[in-house]
């Protein structure tokens, strides 16, 4: 069923930072205003174990593998918790059609892929998240998303 509304599906990225929480609040308000679906994404960054660490004789490959598996499990549980909280906040703000998804890898690439695959009409993102360069006006993820998105973007301060 095709809708005549301009905004039918909104994607908002969250990392539980203050900026992403403000973006979530704005996206939830827009979702309510436009009766649009709200898709919330949290991205787990790929953090490969450096190849040269595998060359250290004291570290057995089983130990390295166990560490990688434990890290992945912890990051997935963190993502699930972040998304559970985000869904609750969106609901409190009035959003009724809310979905969550976990992305992996480079955050900007993952956000852009989901936006394209899910045919979102708008991406809402905070100015900067939990990255290292706090003094920047736009974070690297926000910049990459807005520069490469095929849809409208709203950057929330």
Predicted regions and their residues:
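Small/aliphatic-rich secondary-structure junction motif
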Residues: 2-64, 93
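Short, flexible loop segments at boundaries between secondary-structure elements
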Residues: 151-156
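Glycine-rich, Arg-bearing micro-motifs that act as flexible, cationic patches
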Residues: 116, 122-147
């Amino acid at each position: 069923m095709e809708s005549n509304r301009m905004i039918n599906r909104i994607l908002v990225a969250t990392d539980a930072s203050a900026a992403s929480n403000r973006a979530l609040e704005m996206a939830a308000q827009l979702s309510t205003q436009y009766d649009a679906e709200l898709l919330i994404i949290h991205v787990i960054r790929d953090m490969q174990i450096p190849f040269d660490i595998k060359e250290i004789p004291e570290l057995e490959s089983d130990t390295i593998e166990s560490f990688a598996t434990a890290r992945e499990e912890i990051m997935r549980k963190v993502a699930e918790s972040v998304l559970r909280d985000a869904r609750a906040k969106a609901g409190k703000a009035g959003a009724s059609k809310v979905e969550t998804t976990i992305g992996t890898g480079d955050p900007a690439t993952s956000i852009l892929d989901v936006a394209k695959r899910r045919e979102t009409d708008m991406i809402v993102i905070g100015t900067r998240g939990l990255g290292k360069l706090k003094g920047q006006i736009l974070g690297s993820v926000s910049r990459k998303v807005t520069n490469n998105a095929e849809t409208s973007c709203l950057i929330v301060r």
